[in-house]
UniProtKB/Swiss-Prot annotation:
It is an enzyme of class 2 (transferase). Its EC number is 2.1.1.172. Specifically methylates the guanine in position 1207 of 16S rRNA in the 30S particle. It is found in: Cytoplasm. The lineage of its organism: Bacteria, Pseudomonadati, Pseudomonadota, Gammaproteobacteria, Oceanospirillales. Its main location: cytoplasm. InterPro entries: DNA_methylase_N6_adenine_CS, Mtase_sm_N, N4/N6-MTase_EcoPI_Mod-like, rRNA_ssu_MeTfrase_C, RsmC/RlmG, SAM-dependent_MTases_sf, Small_mtfrase_dom. GO terms for molecular function: 16S rRNA (guanine(1207)-N(2))-methyltransferase activity; DNA binding. One of its GO terms (cellular component) is cytoplasm. This is Ribosomal RNA small subunit methyltransferase C.
Amino acid sequence: MSQLSNPSQAFLRQRGQLSGRILLCSPPADAIAAELRQTGVEVSVLSWDHTAVNACRGAVAEEWLFTDLALPADAQWDQIALFMPKARELLDLMLSVVAPALKHAQHIWLVGEKREGVESAAKRLAKEDWDATKVDSARHCQVWSLTPPADWKPKQNDFWRAYELAQEKVDTLQLFTLPGVFSAGRLDEGTEVLLQSLPELHGRRLLDFGCGCGVIGATLKKRYPKASVELTDINLLALKSAARTAEANGVELNVYASDGLAEVQPGVDAIITNPPFHQGVKQDTRVTQQFLRDCARVLKPGGSLTLVANRFLPYPDWIEAHVGPVRVLFENSRFKVYHAVR
């Protein structure tokens, strides 16, 4: 089971109780679906993670993406496994999405790492009159068995957050975010200093990598209305947020899922990004390092990269190794904004 994450390994310890049709909600990006299929169960997947969906393809009967924030009203499974989301506030969203199917399920599981809050989530549900029983602990994870109260209804919450951003040189932006999307409900400091430090950009094709709610992409389109602006993310809730941000501001943005730069076609004139370097509660620079390696393929000769990062991370060495000489456009006690031309 070396290809399985700790939560998946903990869940598979329950294989003696797994049968029939199972819905995996927000599973890790690993081989959990394929492992379950080998036990004879029929697996469906509901996920907002582009990478996890790709990992499950070929091993599932059905898949849904959290794009419409709803399941068919008649959707039914024998068992439902809720994998603890990396952002804790997403659990309420997940429960709201699967609510129509919960009453039909014979068994509901909650699985996750202790440090990602699975125990506190289970105890919170218990305070809301759920029957929550811890059935296993392994691999620094816990597995809980859940039963909702007979009169349970999902929280009435449209889950959208909105805020405005006033900037120089462009109109005030209306920004929309869903739970778990980076910089949800407010502009983070890193993106703020990046936008304030942007150099003059050249070319017709601009890319916002790891777009979150779309604030960078929308700003670029306002500043360069003739440019084609692309926004990518692996979080499908981020893409939904960015699409709504585009609509609210009357701008046309090309928003699509991409695992790093894998789905981005070559010929980009400029990449502007506050790149992701956290996976759940762990710091992880692998995504950014792979992104920088791929920049040479995606950027045109003479194309540029503008990037904000925590100042303690060794971005200059990585950027120079894969893109070109680095200039520091801005720095303070927390962040640096780097610019390089291929």
